[in-house]
Amino acid sequence: MAIKNILALVVLLSVVGVSVAIPQLLDLDYYRSKCPKAEEIVRGVTVQYVSRQKTLAAKLLRMHFHDCFVRGCDGSVLLKSAKNDAERDAVPNLTLKGYEVVDAAKTALERKCPNLISCADVLALVARDAVAVIGGPWWPVPLGRRDGRISKLNDALLNLPSPFADIKTLKKNFANKGLNAKDLVVLSGGHTIGISSCALVNSRLYNFTGKGDSDPSMNPSYVRELKRKCPPTDFRTSLNMDPGSALTFDTHYFKVVAQKKGLFTSDSTLLDDIETKNYVQTQAILPPVFSSFNKDFSDSMVKLGFVQILTGKNGEIRKRCAFPN
């Protein structure tokens, strides 16, 4: 890596508050000499898909997050298994969507620059570009990740944060990945474009403590609204995680959480910690022009993209994202 690029990356990481032991692991210009149009190719494919189906932005962002939280940002969430025991087969990942976008971007790259760009990098770029397509923030994606060869269902179950988790558990989950409480609340803000289903909220509505009760931390009016949408036996109906602003990347999610209308326990529990609560309440009342959320989200996404990465001779560059070479 050229000295100027190392310095540029160090400056970038200093600006966004990221601490990385060896800054030259990744490079903003990693593919510039061998495949200068790599990012342009990925962006073109992503725009093509997301402009037709805006809900893909949330799905691709979620996929990148789930990839990074299990064995690091190594594309292991993309791997298939003949025995259905890969990460994508774990219950939390059964609802992941958008694989076709990653595959299309990888195929386009293989035509232009074969055996060069990792699926892990493709997924990181696709997630960034998908959010940008719907008007969300754009963030720099240092490149040079390598693809993992291992993908285990149990790893996903052990590492992915649960929508039923309390704040203490979530902070521990994030700390294990080198992410702090601010990253937790900021990345939770990605739920501003999130979509879920009655299946993940049913217990909060009808059997929170095993006695047929509702979660007392929820706004009673929101409980009534959700019960109308989700009868006790309905596990399929889709729910917007940010009602009224579901396809807009903005701070409305924090207003919802501040009103005790967070869909998941993991949303509501952000009010149970001083630091995360202060962030929620601040973003909830600030006019968008004064909000730091877009920058904060960009900073935390850069940090997320460095979690347990494979570089150098570790891992491989997959030819097809669903299968190891």
Curated annotation (Swiss-Prot):
<dbReference type="Pfam" id="PF00141">
    <property type="entry name" value="peroxidase"/>
</dbReference>
<dbReference type="GO" id="GO:0046872">
    <property type="term" value="F:metal ion binding"/>
</dbReference>
<keyword id="KW-0964">Secreted</keyword>
<feature type="binding site">
    <location>
        <position position="245"/>
    </location>
    <ligand>
        <name>Ca(2+) 2</name>
    </ligand>
</feature>
<dbReference type="GO" id="GO:0009506">
    <property type="term" value="C:plasmodesma"/>
</dbReference>
<keyword id="KW-0325">Glycoprotein</keyword>
<keyword id="KW-1015">Disulfide bond</keyword>
<feature type="binding site">
    <location>
        <position position="192"/>
    </location>
    <ligand>
        <name>Ca(2+) 2</name>
    </ligand>
</feature>
<dbReference type="GO" id="GO:0005576">
    <property type="term" value="C:extracellular region"/>
</dbReference>
<dbReference type="GO" id="GO:0020037">
    <property type="term" value="F:heme binding"/>
</dbReference>
<keyword id="KW-0479">Metal-binding</keyword>
<dbReference type="InterPro" id="IPR002016">
    <property type="entry name" value="Haem_peroxidase"/>
</dbReference>
<keyword id="KW-0560">Oxidoreductase</keyword>
<comment type="similarity">
    <text>Belongs to the peroxidase family. Classical plant (class III) peroxidase subfamily.</text>
</comment>
<keyword id="KW-0376">Hydrogen peroxide</keyword>
<dbReference type="GO" id="GO:0042744">
    <property type="term" value="P:hydrogen peroxide catabolic process"/>
</dbReference>
<keyword id="KW-0349">Heme</keyword>
<feature type="binding site">
    <location>
        <position position="76"/>
    </location>
    <ligand>
        <name>Ca(2+) 1</name>
    </ligand>
</feature>
<keyword id="KW-0575">Peroxidase</keyword>
<comment type="function">
    <text>Removal of H(2)O(2), oxidation of toxic reductants, biosynthesis and degradation of lignin, suberization, auxin catabolism, response to environmental stresses such as wounding, pathogen attack and oxidative stress. These functions might be dependent on each isozyme/isoform in each plant tissue.</text>
</comment>
<feature type="binding site" description="axial binding residue">
    <location>
        <position position="191"/>
    </location>
    <ligand>
        <name>heme b</name>
    </ligand>
</feature>
<feature type="signal peptide">
    <location>
        <begin position="1"/>
        <end position="21"/>
    </location>
</feature>
<dbReference type="GO" id="GO:0009505">
    <property type="term" value="C:plant-type cell wall"/>
</dbReference>
<dbReference type="InterPro" id="IPR033905">
    <property type="entry name" value="Secretory_peroxidase"/>
</dbReference>
<feature type="active site" description="Proton acceptor">
    <location>
        <position position="66"/>
    </location>
</feature>
<feature type="glycosylation site" description="N-linked (GlcNAc...) asparagine">
    <location>
        <position position="207"/>
    </location>
</feature>
<keyword id="KW-0732">Signal</keyword>
<feature type="disulfide bond">
    <location>
        <begin position="68"/>
        <end position="73"/>
    </location>
</feature>
<dbReference type="InterPro" id="IPR000823">
    <property type="entry name" value="Peroxidase_pln"/>
</dbReference>
<feature type="binding site">
    <location>
        <position position="72"/>
    </location>
    <ligand>
        <name>Ca(2+) 1</name>
    </ligand>
</feature>
<feature type="disulfide bond">
    <location>
        <begin position="198"/>
        <end position="230"/>
    </location>
</feature>
<protein>
    <recommendedName>
        <fullName>Peroxidase 1</fullName>
        <ecNumber>1.11.1.7</ecNumber>
    </recommendedName>
</protein>
<feature type="binding site">
    <location>
        <position position="250"/>
    </location>
    <ligand>
        <name>Ca(2+) 2</name>
    </ligand>
</feature>
<dbReference type="InterPro" id="IPR019794">
    <property type="entry name" value="Peroxidases_AS"/>
</dbReference>
<feature type="binding site">
    <location>
        <position position="70"/>
    </location>
    <ligand>
        <name>Ca(2+) 1</name>
    </ligand>
</feature>
<feature type="binding site">
    <location>
        <position position="67"/>
    </location>
    <ligand>
        <name>Ca(2+) 1</name>
    </ligand>
</feature>
<keyword id="KW-0106">Calcium</keyword>
<feature type="binding site">
    <location>
        <position position="161"/>
    </location>
    <ligand>
        <name>substrate</name>
    </ligand>
</feature>
<feature type="disulfide bond">
    <location>
        <begin position="35"/>
        <end position="113"/>
    </location>
</feature>
<feature type="binding site">
    <location>
        <position position="74"/>
    </location>
    <ligand>
        <name>Ca(2+) 1</name>
    </ligand>
</feature>
<dbReference type="GO" id="GO:0006979">
    <property type="term" value="P:response to oxidative stress"/>
</dbReference>
<keyword id="KW-0408">Iron</keyword>
